[in-house]
């Protein structure tokens, strides 16, 4: 399995997963997860994509995929968007369900030893706001980005669309 960012047009990026059987012949990749949602490129000087892209095998039919918000904060809380989420993907048909929202740039996914109900997720937050989260596989978890974070924006400014309140619990988040 390979996750990658696909540039659909000059200003549209989305996330795909393909797979191939390893052999001595050229690899023939088949689509596993194809989604037409995209985020727009920005022309900012510091253009970190915050794309996520970590995969974790759950069982023979499902993988998890972390998808960052690509610096488009509002997408993390939008349940109609795959961005700023962790997805459980059925590799047989590409269908997915959201297991975590309110993520900025989820980079690490790991199983917990002797536990199939939770995973461990690491996330690059804003300045001083990296997170380690224990995520339930049995319900949708909301980790609050961009409403709550213990970090600060790198430019030091307060943003209306991403206020970064310093409490997750006070705002109803994990």
Where on the chain are the PLM-derived regions?
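Beta-propeller domain segments
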Residues: 62, 69-174
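Acidic, Gly/Ser/Thr-rich repeat motifs that build Ca2+-stabilized beta-propeller blades
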Residues: 1-73, 108-125, 174
């Amino acid at each position: 399995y390979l996750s990658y960012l696909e540039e659909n047009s000059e200003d549209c990026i989305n996330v795909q997963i393909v797979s191939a059987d390893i052999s001595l012949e050229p690899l023939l990749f088949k689509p596993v997860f194809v989604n037409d949602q995209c985020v727009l490129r920005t022309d900012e000087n510091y253009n970190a994509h915050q794309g996520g892209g970590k995969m974790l095998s759950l069982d023979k039919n499902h993988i998890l995929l972390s998808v960052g918000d690509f610096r488009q904060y509002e997408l993390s809380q939008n349940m109609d968007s795959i961005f700023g989420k962790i997805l459980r993907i059925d590799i047989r048909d590409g269908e997915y369900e959201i297991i975590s929202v309110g993520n900025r740039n989820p980079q690490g996914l790991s199983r917990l030893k002797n536990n199939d109900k939770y995973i461990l997720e690491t996330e690059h937050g804003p300045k001083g706001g990296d997170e380690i989260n224990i995520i339930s596989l049995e319900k949708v978890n909301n980790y609050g980005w961009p409403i709550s974070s213990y970090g600060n924006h790198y430019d030091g400014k307060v943003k209306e669309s991403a206020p970064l309140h310093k409490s997750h619990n006070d705002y109803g988040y994990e």
